[in-house]
């Protein structure tokens, strides 16, 4: 018996040569395709309103793109750090379970892929299979396109959907069509995809075979959960818990014993642009010449993650006896907050708002922390973070979990600053030696002669209990940080600056990141949990400029990059 024809071609008959020889389509204006996990069939439904054309955001002028690196990924020359290695970069859970090689998707076909499409055309979609995942980018091979290389899409773009989503949006198929890329002209498209009075030519045999295989695999758990991409985009775009123009207390990075009042002026996901403005400053703002990156001036931006150690809620400084530079009105307001006799202003960032999500630490455990305890510190205020230093707890704050700490390099309190015990910078005694990180020597100590045991005995001090500091990430996650894997990294001093970068070394939970185009002397240490490490594609999603790698002046490609 003749093998039944493809389920993608309804009511057609096939001769022994495999060609369609007659069609018995019943044409109705409102008939449409409905996709289940097993087959396609028609149902009647009233037409729906036109689906709005999804137009990509205009690309920022001068921004770097990952196109060359993505092409190199096919040849195995470039490997990307996976999204799941960077926990918390976006509020997306188990993303890798929904986007991995072999998954089937529904993809919007844009004019760059099909020149026959215009802004007045119906939205064209076709089916594809994920072949690779690189950061926030996925490579998708279109069904039936044997001679076309996979195309790259941003996994959070408006170009990829779960199977069947188009039919739910436009059941009558009036403003949306499904069409293979190889069939550019309308009359080349099989009648199954474009109904008309003229019979369509047969689908080429290779394409038909792939469509059969594609359909057969739909019930093999190779399709994403319904509406998963809409849910992921919703999570990525969900409103921040902060609002524009809210005021927050900000650690002065030039004088870390001082707190200033700042305003939230921009919000991109977890990243906030916070600036000290004239309305909250008790005197004239420091001039541009002062090179204070936190003060509002033209072309000056200070960006931090919403969990940054720079940020504190209104009233924090007053409660903990920290020096505050602010107007008399603010000082009086925060004093009432600290005393419990006043209420927050609607623009105040409160303790509950800023510290939402911070782990609760029991009083019993907090009692293990003592003034004078020592530890190893990746100094977040250092100009270049390439080593650890010896540091000490100077004070226990009234706000539970907060400490005043400082490096032992100076006996002065001028370098001390407040920080929560749950942070990325404090490490247990012996961490640097165990994982091969340079520990800055103290004054009077010969190179390579520093020993923790002798130092603690000399200072009559004890080390901070290891259980008070963050544990190592899982071995599985640490192994994701392989040498050479690329990502986007925020400059830890120039916080408005995000650059393409790669993993250079791994030391326990600490990674040395090299900025593309920069010498290794500018590489910096980051914690694996740092929110300053971002997957490739973060800047594109949030429409933030990704800096070009620095190129030598004599480099022929220097006109496309930035000069050293």
Curated annotation (Swiss-Prot):
InterPro entries, per the entry: Mbt (IPR004092), PcG_chromatin_remod_factors (IPR050548)
Disruption phenotype: No visible phenotype.
GO biological process: negative regulation of DNA-templated transcription
Signal sequence, start to end: none
Entry GO CC: nucleus
Keyword Repeat attached: yes
UniProt xrefs under Pfam families: MBT
GO MF, one example: chromatin binding
Keywords linked to the UniProt accession: Repeat
The MBT repeat ranges on this chain: 64-176, 205-327, 331-442, 450-549
Disulfide bonds: none
Domain of life: Eukaryota
Subunit structure, interactors included: Interacts with histone H3 that is trimethylated at 'Lys-9' (H3K9me3).
Protein name per UniProt: Malignant brain tumor repeat protein 1
Organism whose genome encodes this protein: Caenorhabditis elegans
């Amino acid at each position: 018996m003749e093998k039944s024809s493809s389920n993608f071609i309804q009511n057609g008959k096939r001769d022994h040569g495999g060609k369609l020889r007659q069609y018995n389509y019943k044409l109705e204006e409102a008939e449409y395709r409905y996709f289940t996990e097993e087959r396609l069939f028609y149902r009647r439904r009233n037409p729906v309103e036109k689906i709005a054309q999804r137009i990509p955001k205009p690309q920022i002028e001068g921004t770097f793109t990952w196109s060359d690196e993505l092409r190199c990924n096919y040849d195995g020359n470039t490997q990307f750090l996976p999204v799941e290695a960077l926990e918390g970069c976006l509020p997306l859970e188990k993303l890798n379970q929904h986007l991995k090689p072999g998954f089937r998707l529904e993809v919007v076909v844009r004019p760059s892929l099909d020149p026959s499409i215009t802004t007045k055309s119906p939205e064209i979609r076709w089916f594809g299979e994920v072949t690779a995942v690189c950061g926030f980018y996925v490579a998708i091979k279109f069904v039936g396109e044997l001679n076309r290389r996979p195309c790259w899409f941003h996994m959070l773009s408006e170009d990829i959907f779960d199977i069947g989503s188009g039919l739910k949006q436009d059941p009558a198929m009036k403003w949306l069509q499904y069409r293979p890329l190889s069939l550019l002209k309308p009359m080349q498209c099989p009648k199954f995809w474009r109904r008309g009075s003229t019979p369509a030519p047969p689908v080429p045999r290779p394409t038909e075979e792939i469509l059969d295989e594609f359909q057969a695999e739909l019930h093999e758990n190779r399709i994403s959960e319904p509406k998963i991409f809409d849910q992921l985009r919703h999570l990525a775009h969900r409103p921040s818990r902060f609002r524009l123009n809210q005021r927050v207390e900000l650690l002065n990075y030039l004088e870390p014993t001082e707190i200033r009042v700042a305003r939230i002026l921009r919000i991109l996901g977890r990243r906030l642009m916070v600036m000290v403005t004239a309305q909250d400053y008790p005197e004239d703002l420091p001039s541009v010449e002062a090179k204070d990156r936190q003060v509002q001036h033209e072309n000056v931006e200070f960006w931090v993650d919403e969990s940054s150690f720079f940020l504190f809620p209104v009233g924090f400084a007053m409660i903990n006896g920290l020096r505050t530079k602010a107007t008399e009105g603010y000082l009086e307001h925060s004093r009432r907050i600290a005393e419990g006799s006043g209420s927050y202003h609607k623009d105040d960032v409160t303790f509950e708002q800023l510290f939402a999500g911070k782990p609760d630490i029991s009083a019993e455990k907090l009692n293990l922390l003592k003034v004078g305890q020592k530890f190893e510190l990746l100094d977040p205020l250092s100009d270049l973070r390439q080593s650890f230093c010896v540091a000490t707890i100077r004070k226990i704050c009234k706000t539970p979990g907060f400490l005043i700490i400082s490096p032992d390099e100076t006996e002065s309190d001028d370098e001390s600053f407040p920080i929560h015990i749950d942070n990325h910078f404090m490490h247990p005694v012996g961490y640097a030696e165990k994982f091969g990180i340079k520990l800055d020597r103290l004054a009077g100590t010969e190179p390579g002669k520093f020993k923790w045991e002798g130092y603690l005995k000399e200072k009559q001090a004890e080390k901070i209990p290891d259980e008070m500091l963050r544990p190592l990430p899982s071995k599985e996650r640490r192994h994701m940080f392989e040498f050479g894997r690329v990502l986007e990294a925020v400059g830890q001093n120039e916080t408005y600056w995000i650059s393409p970068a790669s993993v250079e070394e791994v030391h326990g939970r600490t990674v040395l990141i090299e900025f593309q185009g920069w010498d290794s002397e500018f590489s910096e240490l980051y914690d694996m949990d740092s929110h300053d490490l971002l997957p490739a594609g973060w800047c594109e999603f949030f429409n933030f400029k990704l800096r070009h790698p620095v190129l030598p002046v004599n480099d022929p490609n220097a006109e496309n990059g930035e000069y050293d």
